[in-house]
A protein has these predicted regions:
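C-terminal regulatory/effector modules of DNA-binding transcriptional regulators
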Residues: 60-64, 79-80, 90-93, 97-101, ...
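A short glycine-rich, His/Asp/Glu-containing loop-to-beta-strand
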Residues: 41, 69-70, 81-87, 167-169
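Short, catalytically relevant binding-site loops at active-site mouths
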Residues: 50, 75, 88-91
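HTH-adjacent hinge/linker in prokaryotic transcriptional regulators
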Residues: 1-66, 95-120, 175-183
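A general secondary-structure boundary signal
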Residues: 9-11, 85, 161, 165
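Hydrophobic beta-strand positions
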Residues: 73-74, 154
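Conserved beta-strand segments that form the floor/walls of ligand-binding pockets within enzyme
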Residues: 12, 69, 88, 149
Length: 183
């Protein structure tokens, strides 16, 4: 096995193959959107932010625009956390915060029922990253350990972004599976 060292808590031997805590199969748009169905969302913090250059690019908006940032941790069946997710919504949708974490309803669905928004277009980008020190402590991993980052952007019927979620999954806690067939 592999030895993992953590300052202040000693070393431990772990498996060469990490245990996957959550698997998401993707065979249709409906399955993409059901990511939250089997998980529980815990809101850690929310605040109105003004976008800097980096966030403006991610949110496809102007610099210095206001958005509600909601910091969350997602759990699969009360196990270790599977991801840290920052959710960004427009300030006029700030009542969303009072409706999150009550069940497994996806955030875009809650927004839809509260504000009559339809997700007409969803984009998804995945790439490798590393966990920063603040989140690593909460997620129970070493700082700078590898992560899978998934950015989802939800656009309404007017091609306007109404939600962006940036999820950071520590290595071994999430598997994304997709089967495709030529038609």
């Amino acid at each position: 096995g592999m030895i993992v060292r953590r300052q202040g808590s000693g070393s431990r031997v772990i498996s060469k193959i990490p245990t996957t805590l959550f698997v998401q199969n993707l065979n249709s748009i409906e399955e993409l959107l059901q990511y939250s169905k089997d998980t529980q969302l815990e809101v850690r913090k929310s605040e109105i932010i003004r976008t800097n250059e980096e966030f403006a690019e991610t949110l496809e908006c102007s610099i210095n625009e206001e958005w509600l940032k909601i910091e969350t941790v997602r759990f699969a069946q009360k196990q270790s956390p599977i991801c840290w997710t920052n959710i960004f919504v427009r300030p006029e949708h700030s009542d969303l915060i009072n409706h999150l974490g009550k069940d497994g309803t996806p955030v875009y669905t809650v927004l839809g029922s509260l504000f009559n928004i339809v997700a007409e277009k969803i984009s998804l980008n995945m790439f490798a990253g590393s966990m920063d020190e603040k989140r690593s402590w909460i997620m129970g991993v070493e700082p700078n350990s590898p992560t899978l980052i998934i950015i989802r952007k939800y656009k309404d019927q007017n091609d306007r972004i109404f939600e962006v979620s940036i999820s950071e999954h520590p290595a071994g806690r999430f598997t994304f599976s997709s089967d495709m067939q030529r038609t």
